[in-house]
């Protein structure tokens, strides 16, 4: 029987349990696991809505729908992004990783989401612990960097193709104009 899962955190939990991953990824200890689950449950309401939705609405929705959004319409996501980064900074100011002193799938999820902020040229200078953690996560997880490099290549190709087919009338997601005002 084929198992089909469509939610990223469900997939991460399943893989951590079914593949014999080291315990730190998704701890057997219920208290530690609850910390990981807590972050994963918060992730979609803060970081995903901040980074993911902002990137989609600002950069890719205009290519798909032909409709642009005003800065005022994007402000909601900028506020969520600022709050999410403050939450990450608070956690990472106390511990090396989001849920303690060992890396977990919560860190992997957050790092992947934040790495996509390259599309909006987000600077993390206001959040030094978060910035250091993200660079550490990227350095320690070469596969993540490799996969994201492939995704950036596909995205740049997508943008270039859209510009070519639509007379260049599009905000380049790799330009400074795509950066949110935090």
Which role does the model predict for each range below?
Residues 37-43, 132-146:
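Short, mixed-charge aromatic SLiMs
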Residues 150-182:
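Acidic/histidine-enriched, glycine/proline-rich intrinsically disordered or flexible terminal extensions
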Residues 1-75, 79, 171-182:
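GST-like domain detector, emphasizing the conserved glutathione-binding G-site
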Residues 74-92:
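Amphipathic alpha-helical packing segments from all-alpha helical-bundle domains
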Residues 21-22, 90-101, 142-148:
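Surface-exposed helix-capping loop/turn segments at secondary-structure junctions
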């Amino acid at each position: 029987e084929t198992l089909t899962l469509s939610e990223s955190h469900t997939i991460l939990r399943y893989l951590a349990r079914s593949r014999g991953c080291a315990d730190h990824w998704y701890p057997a200890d219920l208290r530690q696991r609850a910390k990981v689950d807590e972050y994963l449950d918060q992730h979609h309401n803060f970081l995903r809505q901040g980074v993911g939705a902002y990137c989609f609405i600002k950069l890719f929705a205009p290519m798909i729908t032909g409709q642009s959004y005003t800065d005022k319409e994007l402000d909601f996501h900028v506020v969520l992004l600022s709050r999410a980064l403050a939450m990450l900074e608070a956690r990472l100011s106390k511990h090396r990783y989001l849920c303690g002193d060992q890396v977990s799938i919560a860190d992997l999820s957050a790092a992947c989401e934040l790495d996509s902020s390259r599309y909006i040229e987000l600077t993390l200078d206001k959040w030094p612990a978060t910035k250091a953690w993200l660079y550490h996560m990227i350095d320690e997880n070469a596969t993540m960097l490799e996969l994201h490099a492939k995704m950036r290549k596909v995205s740049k190709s997508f943008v270039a193709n859209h510009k070519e087919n639509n007379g260049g009338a599009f905000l380049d997601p790799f330009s400074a104009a795509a950066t949110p005002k935090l």
